[in-house]
Amino acid sequence: MKIALINENSQAAKNGIIEAALKKVVEPMGHEVVNYGMYAADDAAQLTYVQCGILAAILLNSGAADYVITGCGTGEGAMLALNSFPGVICGHVEDPVDAYTFAHVNDGNAVAMPFAKGFGWGGELNLEYCFEKLFGFGHGQGYPKERVEPEQRNKKILDGVRAATFKPLIDCLKSIDPDLLKGAVAGERFSELFFASCKDAELAAYVKTLL
């Protein structure tokens, strides 16, 4: 699995801590971490949590990433931004129980975490434990186990509702302020990382018009 890490500007200084915790947990599982930044608070490209949603949607819908880890001060804004787009089901994860139940009950493809609220002494340990529960035990297996059938059924119903209420991603992007879009893909390593992994030629061609 290719796991993308995205940080917005208010918590960009923690990017290295988050990346280290994520890699420590998931690389031994055989997953790959791709860090799209922000890498530091003074990066030239300043991502807002709204732009994290745009970038996450581009990565997931294009196949450039299979999963996205992101967040903001509380995680709430990033979660709302990601869930504004088709092809993205983002949970809000504060602790390992959130991580495990989201993986097995909701079976999404992104999480938003609080990187300021509650992030004190031992914060990196909480990240590691969350990532262990998020990626270490599979997905969509239900919790409690005896609830797996109705939970999987409800997940399929939700997927159907979302398919009916969202329009294709490129149509969504064309309706958004171009400057907001350009800022979302302005990261110093975006082009290098994205085009090497993108599996959707149409979306790749559209993204090139933003650069």
Range-by-range predicted roles:
Residues A4-I17, Y100-L210:
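C-terminal binding/interaction regions
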Residues K14-M29:
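Short, solvent-exposed amphipathic alpha-helices that sit
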Residues K14-N15, G53, G75-A81:
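Short glycine/serine/threonine-rich phosphate/pyrophosphate-binding segments
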Residues M29-A45:
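A short beta-strand-loop structural module common to alpha/beta enzyme folds
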Residues Y49-Y67:
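Short, structured active-site "lid" loops
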Residues A65-G71, C90:
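A short, small-residue-rich loop immediately preceding and capping a beta-strand
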Residues G77-C90, E94-V97:
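Short Gly/Thr/Asp-enriched flexible loops that form oxyanion-binding sites at enzyme active sites
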